[in-house]
Amino acid sequence: MKTWIKWTAGTVGVLIVAAAAAAIVGTQLAERKRNRVIDIKVKPVAIPNDAAAIERGRYLYASRGCVDCHAANGAGRAFIDSGDMKIAGPNISPAPGNVVAKYQSEDWVRTLRHGVKPSGKPLFIMPSEDYNRLTDEDTGALIAYVKSLPPVPGDAGVVKLPLPVKVIYGFGGIPDPVEKIDHSLPPPKPVAAAVTVEHGAYLAAMCIGCHGAGLSGGKIPGGPPDWPAAANITPGDKSVMPAYKDGTSFAAMMKTGKRPDGSAIKVMPFESLRELNEVDVQ
């Protein structure tokens, strides 16, 4: 009996030491990963200043998820605040001294499309994989709108991660945006806005961050443990799409945040999705 107790205690002790060592190493790897410098060569986009382009940028800002992290006025806000985990988007209004105050066109492109700061360090939570396939025209319009916002007070971004998330990130279990993007792809060509597969594919790029490159769903990278997995929205087995009898019922879900049975869907960025116009939502 005493031998068994000693063996058990010894095993537990070894496991505790191993877990502590893994936590230390994982934390160090995470810090190294967040501070690595990535050399991404980008081309600037033209930033227009005409009213039509700025209005297009306003629509993109409202409907492509920007408000969910940066707020409607660009001041930034917390969008994950769960126990030891807090993530807040920074103030991106043209207020003096804020994170984008000195951004040139190349800096915006590198951040939006590639998930890389002007310093070359990776962004942790920016959904650049969603924005990587924006056309040059839409990228320029979005930047133009943000630059047109009135300056408002706000804070820098916050990325506070619990120890398990740091360790998983450090060991590569959670990729940052720069790892999810094919940086060699050229910007896409403009697609006419219409209820077509081509235009739908352009819009569906905004879903990649949560639903994955193939839209087959799964655990949302970097999300809190209480977040549900993103749904499989492809045709076929294990898809949620059979619950929607037609495009109208799916569009209704995008606007209301509710399934056809009336149950609410969690986590989806409905504040943005409800801003989609009738052509885009179809």
Predicted segments with their positions:
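Short, solvent-exposed interaction modules
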Residues: 110-119, 175-182, 186-190, 253-261
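Periplasmic/extracellular electron-transfer cofactor-ligation site
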Residues: 62-86, 114-122, 149-154, 201-228, ...
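N-terminal type II signal-anchor transmembrane helix
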Residues: 2-37
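C-type cytochrome heme c attachment motif
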Residues: 59-71, 90, 107-113, 127-128, ...
